[in-house]
């Protein structure tokens, strides 16, 4: 088991800021407590420098938003270019697949 780090420690950081296009936006679903959940994919494309070489980066990944953030994603809609702030976690407790949990988003 991974030790639980001190919340003030830099080892506890898990923050992602990334831009992309919302794709595959599923119909919203709801938790038993009535919170909206929005699941979608974010398609990212950029140019990045690595070891002095320009690289074209293109990929898609799964993201999930809950409550007010989910409502915002649903309003923004599929095909929109956004900047997302969030953290990475396992898709569920039985999976090792990673997903971005969205804390905030804005249209760009």
UniProtKB/Swiss-Prot annotation:
Can you supply a Gene Ontology BP term from the record?
DNA replication, synthesis of primer
- Stored Gene3D superfamilies: Nucleic acid-binding proteins (2.40.50.140)
Residue intervals of the SSB domain = 11-108
Which terms does the record give in the GO molecular function aspect? single-stranded DNA binding
User: Does the entry feature the keyword S-adenosyl-L-methionine, yes or no?
Assistant: no
Name the UniProt key words of this record, in alphabetical order. Answer: DNA replication, DNA-binding, Primosome
Q: Can the keyword Nucleotide-binding be found in this entry's annotation?
A: no
- Residue stretches spanning the membrane: none
Gene Ontology terms: cellular component: primosome complex
Protein task: Involved in the restart of stalled replication forks, which reloads the replicative helicase on sites other than the origin of replication; the PriA-PriB pathway is the major replication restart pathway. During primosome assembly it facilitates complex formation between PriA and DnaT on DNA; stabilizes PriA on DNA. Stimulates the DNA unwinding activity of PriA helicase.
How does this chain assemble?
Homodimer. Interacts with PriA and DnaT. Component of the replication restart primosome. Primosome assembly occurs via a 'hand-off' mechanism. PriA binds to replication forks, subsequently PriB then DnaT bind; DnaT then displaces ssDNA to generate the helicase loading substrate.
- Family matches, as HAMAP family: PriB (MF_00720)
The record ties this protein, via NCBIfam families, to:
PriB_gamma
The Swiss-Prot or TrEMBL record describes its family as follows: Belongs to the PriB family.
Q: What is this protein called?
A: Replication restart protein PriB
Protein's organism = Nitrosomonas europaea (strain ATCC 19718 / CIP 103999 / KCTC 2705 / NBRC 14298)
Gene coding for it: priB
């Amino acid at each position: 088991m991974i030790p639980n780090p001190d919340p003030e420690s830099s080892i506890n950081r898990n923050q992602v800021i990334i831009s992309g296009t919302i794709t595959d936006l599923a119909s919203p679903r709801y938790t038993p407590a009535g919170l909206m959940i929005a699941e979608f994919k974010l398609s990212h494309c950029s140019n990045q420098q690595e070891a002095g070489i320009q690289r074209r980066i293109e990929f898609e990944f799964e993201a999930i938003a809950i409550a007010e953030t989910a409502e915002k994603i649903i309003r923004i809609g599929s095909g929109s270019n956004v900047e997302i702030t969030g953290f990475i976690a396992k898709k569920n407790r039985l999976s090792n697949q990673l997903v971005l949990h969205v804390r905030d988003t804005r249209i760009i």
